[in-house]
Amino acid sequence: MNVSERLAASAVVPVVVLDDAKDAVATAKALLAGGVDVMEITFRTAAAADSIKAVAESCPDMLVGAGTVITLEQCKKAVDCGAKFIVSPGFDEEVVRWCVENGIAVTPGCVTPTEIMAAMKLGLNVVKIGRAHV
């Protein structure tokens, strides 16, 4: 099953904000123990890249991705650290194009028909619309 298929098959994708990378592996293991094998670690803190790397290296059964990716630099860093998918709060053509060209699953945030059409033009069939607060 490829990354997009695993994401589609997942009942839930937890969005995880970590202030300290030392908590990353324990969080991933707890999710795996609960039957969740996908997680999105956000770039809202300085610990994001190290957290992604720790999970990618220590938890091979966890599909780890990066969220709140807003720059190409963050995107490349996330992928270098082991992120298998990228989620962005907005549509950044540079980020999306780089992901598409490098075979990285990407879900940009889109709120207008123009953004959705731009995503489709780049070959995407999934976009993020809005946010859910639970």
Specify the residue positions occupied by each region the protein language model found:
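Hydrophobic, well-structured mid-protein blocks that either form specific transmembrane helices
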Residues: 76-115, 119
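Conserved small/polar residues in nucleotide/adenosyl-binding loops
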Residues: 132-134
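Expand to "…catalyze enediolate/carbanion chemistry for C-C bond making/breaking, isomerization
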Residues: 122
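Conserved N-terminal beta1-alpha1 strand-loop-helix module at the mouth
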Residues: 1-84, 91, 101
